[in-house]
C-alpha cells in the first residue's frame, strides 16, 4: 500500500498510514498509523486489528498492535503495529503480554500468596 492511504477503523474513527516499511529480514511490515477519532474515545485494539487486516488482506492473528499513544483531548492517536508473514515468526519476536493484549485475554498478576483468608 502507498503511504498516506486511508483506513476506516470504525464509524467514528479513520486512520491515515504515515509509514509502511517492509522488513524482509524479519518477515514483517512495520506500519505507523495516525487515527483521527474526534469526539469519541480511542479505538480499541480489536477495531484497529480488524481494519488493518482488511486493508492489507492479512489474517487478524498476524497483526500486532505494538503501541497506541493518544494526547489528552486531542482526538488523534499514533499507532505502531506489525503485520507478520507467519504465526511462528510472530511468536518468536513479539512479547507474550502483547499477544495476550491483542487477543483480549488478561494476564493474572502476582498478588498476595495468602489468598482470601489472609486477613484474620
Swiss-Prot record:
GO terms for cellular component: ribonucleoprotein complex; ribosome. PANTHER family: 40S RIBOSOMAL PROTEIN S24. Residues 101-120 are annotated as: Disordered. It comes from Saccharolobus islandicus (strain M.16.4 / Kamchatka #3) (Sulfolobus islandicus). The gene is rps24e. This is Small ribosomal subunit protein eS24. Belongs to the eukaryotic ribosomal protein eS24 family. InterPro entries: eRP_eS24_sf, Ribosomal_eS24, Ribosomal_eS24_CS, Ribosomal_uL23/eL15/eS24_sf. SUPFAM superfamilies: Ribosomal proteins S24e, L23 and L15e. It comes from the Archaea. Keywords: Ribonucleoprotein, Ribosomal protein. GO terms for molecular function: structural constituent of ribosome. GO terms for biological process: translation.
